From Swiss-Prot:
This is Elongation factor Tu. It is an enzyme of class 3 (hydrolase). Gene3D superfamilies: P-loop containing nucleotide triphosphate hydrolases, Translation factors. Belongs to the TRAFAC class translation factor GTPase superfamily. Classic translation factor GTPase family. EF-Tu/EF-1A subfamily. The gene is tuf. Coiled coil: none annotated. Residues 19-26 are annotated as: G1. Residues 81-84 are annotated as: G3. Residues 10-207 form the tr-type G domain. It comes from Pseudomonas syringae pv. syringae (strain B728a).
Length: 397
């Protein structure tokens, strides 16, 4: 069968299901694909297919994630669902599946549970910008007051972690009913349709990566006689044009330069765009002024920092991580984009040590500055071996 052409006419949005184990995340994921296939003509995916999610690797960490897609009238959605709680933690911290918005699934019969809270906290830490709530299993709750109570609890919990709890859309329904094609009291297919319409209206269209300010991590530096210095790398975001002023940020003092040429596959171009591997020719920059690990950016868009708070996941022994816990003052290397920088960790109050397999908030101080922003992902390494992953939650200095 020939591969279908990817439809670029609809804007593309990344979402995912989060919430406590057995509250119905995977059932809702399957129901979304079913309802959208009937209403908007995308393909349905069976529950079992999603539940036996394949393994994938992100930053040296194995994660089980199921990716499905569905369409609404106005958008194409890529949706990620994880089978286990540990997979969620790893997924969100490594950014393996970046989400423009999350669907928090909470059982109306049980109300918020420990992982409900933890997933909301993680969403805040890793910068998931929007959450929509689906109160699931509402067909099992006869008491309208109980539904109201659970709704209030969920709103309070969202507000606790700085999400707009009072204004968050909450859809009440039954994913199982929708998956079976039923719709008693509009709790099945109607509720799931309403959820899709809510995703359309509540989660804004993400800024396209080419519209963001230019940033390219420097992987290599060459000097070409008679032409000057060329830095190569994969453009992370934005566009660079010939004659653009640029800054080189990180590891040393920030320097200013100008792009005098863009090269890809030995051809000269007028511009380089996000996602492309290219060489950027720099005017007035010496070969020794630049090194791998710095970034080339639009002036003023990114600053170098050495101190930050991060949410980290520490690999378990089985995943090839450490065999022993670490304590405050732990000094591994932090691998940002293209280079390692040594840093020391302070643990939160009341936390004596961090065990392999844990996730925890730490404060990090690096020995050299790195170009960083909230949401930047990194790996934690010891002598080149990955022992953890993290995300910058808040810059301190």
């Amino acid at each position: 069968m020939a591969k279908e052409k990817f439809d670029r006419s609809l804007p593309h949005v990344n979402v995912g299901t989060i919430g406590h184990v057995d509250h119905g995340k995977t059932t809702l994921t399957a129901a979304l694909t079913r309802v959208c296939s009937e209403v908007f003509g995308s393909a349905a995916v069976e529950f079992d297919k999603i539940d036996s999610a394949p393994e994938e690797k992100a930053r040296g960490i194995t994660i089980n994630t199921a990716h499905v897609e569905y369409k609404s009238l106005i958008r194409h959605y890529a949706h990620v669902d994880c089978p286990g709680h540990a997979d969620y933690v790893k997924n969100m911290i490594t950014g393996a599946a970046q989400m423009d918005g999350a669907i928090l699934v909470c059982s109306a019969a049980d109300g918020p549970m420990p992982q409900t809270r933890e997933h909301i906290l993680l969403s805040r830490q890793v910068g998931v910008p929007y959450i929509v709530v689906f109160l699931n299993k509402a067909d099992l709750v006869d008491d309208a007051e109980l539904l109201e109570l659970v709704e209030m609890e969920v709103r309070d919990l969202l507000s606790t972690y700085d999400f707009p709890g009072d204004d968050t859309p909450i859809i009440i329904g039954s994913a199982r009913m929708a998956l079976e094609g039923k719709d008693d009291n509009e709790m099945g297919t109607t509720a799931v349709r309403k959820l899709v319409e809510t995703l359309d209206s509540y989660i804004p269209e993400p800024v396209r990566v080419t519209d963001k300010p230019f940033l390219m991590p420097i992987e290599d530096v060459f000097s070409i006689s008679g032409r000057g210095t060329v830095v190569t790398g994969r453009i992370e975001r934005g566009i660079v044009k010939v004659q653009d002023p640029l800054e080189i940020v990180g590891l040393r003092d920030t320097t200013v330069t100008t792009c005098t040429g863009v090269e890809m596959f030995r051809k000269l171009l007028d511009e380089g765009r996000a996602g492309e591997n290219c060489g950027v020719l720099l005017r007035g920059t010496k070969r020794d002024d630049v090194e791998r690990g710095q970034v080339l950016v639009k002036p003023g868009s990114v600053k170098p920092h050495t101190q930050f708070e991060a949410e980290i996941y520490v690999l378990s022994k089985e995943e090839g991580g450490r065999h022993t816990p670490f304590f405050k003052g732990y000094r591994p290397q932090f691998y940002f984009r293209t280079t390692d920088v040594t840093g020391s960790c302070e643990l939160p109050e009341g936390v004596e040590m961090v065990m392999p397999g844990d996730n925890v908030k730490v404060s990090v101080t690096l020995i050299k500055p790195i170009a960083m922003e909230d949401g930047l992902r990194f790996a934690i390494r010891e002598g080149g071996r990955t022992v953890g992953a993290g995300v910058v939650a808040k810059i301190i200095a």
